Amino acid sequence: MLSTPPNLLSSRPPSAGRIAVLGGGITGLTTAWRLQRAGLAPVVFEQSGQPGGAIGAITRDGWRHELGPNSLLEGSAEVAALIADVGLGGRRIYAAPAAKQRYIVRDGRMIAMPGSPWAFLGTPLFSWRAKLALLGEPWRRPSPADAEESVADFVVRRLGREFLDYAINPLVGGVYAGDPTLLSVRQAFPKLHALEQAHGSLIRGAWAQRKIRGGPKERIFSFPDGLEELPFALARPLGAAVRLGHRVLGVARGEDGWRVEFERGGVRGGETFAAVVVALPAGVIAALPVENIPGAGRLAALSEIEHPPVVSVFTGYTRAQVRHPLDGFGVLVPQVERRQILGTLFSSTLFPGRAPAGHVALTTFVGGTRDPQLAGLDDPALLRVVQGELASLLGASGAPVFTHVQRWPRAIPQYTLGYQRFKDVVTAVEASAPGFFIGGNCRDGISLANCMEAGRRLADAAAKYVTREGV
């Protein structure tokens, strides 16, 4: 059980290897776990009452609503190794085979995304004009490597308007809850940008990667008790070093190290550390008082990073209430369809334990950059919107037998055009303050895998600093 040390008012001199980690989400926990494995002494300050950040679940009467991320992608050896090292290798449950199929709405009906070249030729999702135009993609000139281009412009230039409207736009809505006309392709989808730069073509690049791809397959997985098993597994060996319910008030650099001031339950305290790792949301970093660092005030610019509101609406039905077979990962809704949802996950198809026997669970997302005003509706109004959309798309009849609404007022950082300036601010502040490190989804990518990889980067940098400086 994670606990909080009683000596809140202690003011201790820095001891060798003590590193403050601000934020107990996946980035912070991965950082601390790796630092401990390296023989150092991390202390995690987390304001909420449990580790994991956006990861969490509501479990009631046989239903499980994943409040934030719903799954992990086993797409890198690093992620697979970390899962095994924290003791969860044997607890992975992989998405059902049916989850390979994904639906897109076109002209009011759900159409399966083609999963092969032959299926692509026959799909009604794209017109023959769009399919034929795609044949010219390998011969289209790439943009300059340093060009700042939106995701929308990139896709239209390489693949055509229809692929933007009925493939990339719904994908961006599902991943970022964002707008492809606003996002930077280099920042939001760096792999797409890299494919074009390396191979001159997305199609040629995809074929080349298929030939050389090794390591684990990109399989989707979770755990029997949901994704929150991961942060708890990371936090468990850290024990009392995870300080829950601690709000960080400020950080200051001094002659004897880094002073972290904090508050818990109205009681203030402070401790000194050899180094500080900041793994907090962008808006929290922007508002964090940081003293005695040249140019630290520039971090206030991070408050300008857009985070649209998103609401996750969980609805449970009896199997007989839903006409659609729910034989897929879920359905994404293109903006051109003018509907009121971003998409719906078929949660009980993905993994077992999400709904009682004889029932189905659906997780629907509302809001984002596309419709931020809808995220402001009250719960009854939101449920009416979602029920109406599910009735139209999936043939869901009657009221759901279970519901839960989870609101994220500032959901996902938007890697918009010009986003590099925010990263440059962070880099400049770090350069002016040895022993002060910043990472997380506002800098390293928004996926859980990105955050886990950021934790490794931050731990390596902090450990190298402490070891080199002998502090």
Language-model segment annotations:
Residues L2-L9, P14, P114-W118, P325-G328, ...:
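Conserved flavin/dinucleotide-binding core of flavoenzymes
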Residues Q36-R60:
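Glycine-rich FAD pyrophosphate-binding loop
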Residues L2, P14, A38, A240, ...:
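Mid-domain catalytic core of redox enzymes
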Residues T27, Q50, G283:
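Conserved Rossmann-like nucleotide-cofactor binding loop
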Residues G17-V44:
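N-terminal Rossmann-like FAD-binding beta1-loop-alpha1 element of flavoenzymes
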Residues G75, R157-R158, A279-L280:
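Short, well-ordered coil/turn residues at beta-beta hairpins
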Residues P14, A133-V251, G257, T272:
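Active-site/ligand-binding neighborhood in enzyme catalytic cores
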Residues D61-S143:
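Dinucleotide-binding Rossmann-like beta1-alpha1 core, especially the glycine-rich loop
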